[in-house]
């Protein structure tokens, strides 16, 4: 269960997997969470990922969450014209996700200076991704 990995993380990024466990199932047991520290033991970065499948068997997605103190990412996105659908979705907690779709593939990305929350999958709708990112209840402390 990916939720069992949450205690490994520092809490700089908080997210809730409860809703996912109720509406999706783990499809590939490749979920991981780990922290990287420098040679002096100081925190550098943390990573989490897990893959989920729709309970009806018709779709899947991978959730990846990364926080790295060495990053200086830009939350600005450049969307090229090849997506069938591309728009911003802001969660109730105020985090902005770029949601895109092309064919049977969907993506959702939220980027801050030090953090990336990313989902990609297939055979799901952009509305499905909106529900997922909303119920993740992401909170980022940078």
What do the PLM-derived regions correspond to, one by one?
Residues 1-112:
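Short, solvent-exposed recognition patches
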């Amino acid at each position: 269960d990916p939720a069992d990995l949450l205690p490994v993380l520092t809490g700089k990024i908080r997210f809730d997997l409860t809703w996912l466990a109720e509406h999706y199932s783990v499809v590939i047991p490749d979920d991981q969470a780990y922290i990287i520290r420098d040679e002096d033991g100081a925190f550098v970065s943390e990573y989490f990922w897990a893959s989920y499948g729709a309970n009806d068997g018709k779709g899947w997605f991978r959730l990846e969450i990364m926080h790295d103190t060495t990053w200086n990412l830009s939350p600005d996105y450049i969307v090229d014209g090849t997506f069938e659908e591309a728009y911003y979705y802001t969660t109730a907690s105020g985090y902005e996700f770029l949601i895109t779709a092309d064919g049977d593939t969907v993506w959702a990305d939220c980027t801050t200076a030090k953090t990336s929350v990313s989902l990609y999958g297939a055979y799901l709708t952009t509305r499905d991704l909106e529900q997922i990112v909303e119920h993740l209840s992401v909170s980022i402390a940078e």
